Amino acid sequence: MKYVYAFKEGNASMRNLLGGKGANLAEMTNLGLPIPQGFTVTTEACTEYYNCGKKISKEIEEEIFKAIGELEKIQGKKFGDNEDPLLVSVRSGARASMPGMMDTILNLGLNDEAVEGFAKKTNNPRFAYDSYRRFIQMYSDVVMEVNKSFFEKIIDELKEELGVHYDTELNVDDLKELVKRFKKIYSDHMNGEEFPQDAREQLMGAVKAVFRSWDNPRAIVYRRMNDIPGDWGTAVNVQAMVFGNMGDTSGTGVAFTRNPSTGEKGIYGESVSYTHLRAHETSLHLV
């Protein structure tokens, strides 16, 4: 049985296996649209995870790392490299849309050494350390279940110490201090264990966390309200990162091929630039 599909191997008809997001990413890839490349770990892998007592089999793990190897070739970067690391996002993707119910991790692949190489490669140390502190917070919350409120408190304390109001006013040295404090929160909650530095360990932890999120309280309530069977499971989409916080030419947004309110055909959406985010400090998720 095949548990992992590159986007180019799937299509829109494979929703039950690849989930809605994975099937649509595959379809867009095959249409030749400029989609950041990646792969999908199937809903059957999620079912197998639960059948095996919440463990990922060696077979599935090997397929995941084989897919990472193929993604490395496409991106021209190495996963776990400290000079020019391949960074990925890890997202859930059930066959039925469940917005906001399950978890996402961004910037996976960064560590204490890779962030320095990433800073040099991008010539943007502030961006690199901003990405790393976001990753530590997401990974700690989603994978290790360290509540994000601990990290938000640290951010507020640092801003108060510095006399600033917005996260975007923190400079690179401030963000390095934030990384140090975030890692201490992680260590304190993990009985002295340090934040994981191995990219492969990070990835497997994230995949397991997405599978687990299928059964988190929010997801269970949502499934009951929307008649979504509990045995469907969720797929996991691993995708090369695109950054919304890289600089003034970056941003974030959403687009639709129909009007979401009326169903009328046409391109609809909204976006916001990083310049605007810096000026107005919105809660929009940077991806």
Give residue ranges: language-model regions:
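Single conserved hydrophobic/aromatic residue that forms the stacking wall/gate
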Residues: 276, 281-287
